[in-house]
Amino acid sequence: MRNQKWIALLGINLFSAGCNSTDLSTSSGGSTVATSGGTSSSFSARPARIYSAALTSCNPMGSGSTSAIDLNLGIAARLYYSPAGQPEYTDVESYMNDGTDLGVDIFFNQVNVIPTYFSAGFPSAAGPPFETPDGSVLMEWFGIRYKSTLRLTANDQPGNYQLATLSDDGSILYLDPTGGQNPVDFVDNDGSHATQMACAKSTLAMDASTQIPFQLDYFQGPRYHLTSMLLWRRVPDGASLSDPACGVVGINTFFDTTHTPSVPQPYYESLLSRGWEVIPAENFVLPDTNPENPCFPGGGILGI
């Protein structure tokens, strides 16, 4: 059911520039999705769009610098909310299917919102935070749909990569490495919960030509703390995909939220020592629906 709704929402175009795949294979450490043979985008041929500063937000939610690192890199996102009179949804699909699109554009360099006390809402590039039609600043009961294309850079080794999410509240990562218009729930971390890690049960076979369009749907329930992080690790051939952190949940397990900003706990640092990392900003290419990043300094596409 999720796959059918996802296809209906996105249509054909999201994956038209996706990678081609050869097969699905299984190793002792879990299944591996082969994704070699992907196509490259011609960034210079993609048309520019002028964005309104009042309706655009750059790296909100305490996710780092407000500037993009490159005109064609980043993650485009849309913001959904539950208007007065509608339920306070506790799952991702309800926000995407039944929530209201606020009509704003959000850009992230990467998915790296560590556990954060979120009370100021989403600041626009013009300064004031976004408001719903009734004048409310969104601090709770909202959903975010991230879209981008995942790739390796020249600094990354080809191989099998396992993905994971850390989120508070729920999130679902969808992707279609086969290029067959069949996106799947690749990492399911849905539901109302404190910061929780969910891990993919299969790996992605990636090389320099691989480009994988993806969508990450996330929702925030009751105020104030939230988390939204996308991680990966390179897995040696035949290695197990099990990790002690997969499925672990806790308010202060991964980060100490009594500090501002939150401080990594030894449990999170041990996760990094096992090869996990937040996917770097250089690995995200903007989708064709938002080909240029208005948060890039000097890009000339962020209006007033």
Task: Set out the residue ranges of the language-model regions.
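Bacterial N-terminal signal peptides that target proteins for export
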Residues: 1-7
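Bacterial N-terminal signal peptides
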Residues: 8-17
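Bacterial Sec-dependent N-terminal signal peptides
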Residues: 16-45
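Acidic/polar, compositionally biased interaction segments
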Residues: 43-304
